[in-house]
Amino acid sequence: MSSSITPSLIAADLFSVDRLVAVVTGGATGIGLMIVKALEENGAKVYIIGRRKEVLDKVAKEEAKHGNIIPLQGDASSKPDLERIVAHITKETGYINLLVANAGISGPDPVRITPSTTLSELQRDLWSLDPSIFAQTFSVNVGTAYFSIAAFLPLLDAGNHKGNVVQSSQAIITSSIGAFGRVPLAHYAYSASKAAVTHMTKQFATALTKYKIRFNILAPGLYPSEMTAGIVKSFEQLSPEERATRVSPLGREGNTEDMAGCILWLASKAGAWLSGNVVVSDGGKLSVTPSSY
């Protein structure tokens, strides 16, 4: 049945996140901060979760355009911390419309394979990794998203009942193009963890259909952040031709406007009919590298 609401094709209405209430884990730096700024500047109330109180407070003080960035210190991989944060938001606001599970780590250093690398050298590098570091990469990049989703389901459900926005409640999980690339740009553990969290999110999209809670995946390419600072700096010296090959066909890394465009589309009425989708924002990188996407 079609909606009885008269549709608006005005961009300011279609992409509006005014009155939206969001939670962003890992929201104080990098892509998370880009998402937070885009949402808050356009009228959303945004709770940001992170471990470093001083960084959270600085973001709330310096980046909020409307005073609606609320810092909540906590570790998104800790169930007690998540329970405490959910209780706080439940008491203060009572609902959320959007969860952005963005917290993650880069994992071990990549295993480099050059034309001169011998099989014995490769085997040595693969075998030398501490199993606990491999496991930690999965625990943070997959487990943190899993427990964040589980923790905030009641508040997302409450958002549907609140009806303060037209679109139904949603969780957006930050993955990576590393989930799809066959030439690993990071360690195998990182790429595999991002492939895992991508598939898990698709399963949630299917499993929770009847509850009207949507799930989508954001898969960025190279964006500037604390994790990618060294990579971005090393690419500054490349020629335009090399940048088009190694960074993206567009010859640059992503920026705040690129990420803002993605999140405003997904989080607003414009993205209300999306669930179970993967949104790749990589300047075309996957289109010119071996990948399974």
From Swiss-Prot:
Q: Which UniProt keywords apply?
A: NADP, Oxidoreductase, Virulence
User: Broadest EC class?
Assistant: oxidoreductase
Q: Give the family per the record.
A: Belongs to the short-chain dehydrogenases/reductases (SDR) family.
GO terms, molecular function: oxidoreductase activity
Q: Which InterPro entries match?
A: NAD(P)-bd_dom_sf, Sc_DH/Rdtase_CS, SDR_fam, Sec_Metab_Biosynth_SDR
Which PANTHER family does this one have? 7-ALPHA-HYDROXYSTEROID DEHYDROGENASE, SHORT CHAIN DEHYDROGENASE_REDUCTASE FAMILY (AFU_ORTHOLOGUE AFUA_5G12480)
This protein's name:
Short-chain dehydrogenase/reductase PhomF'
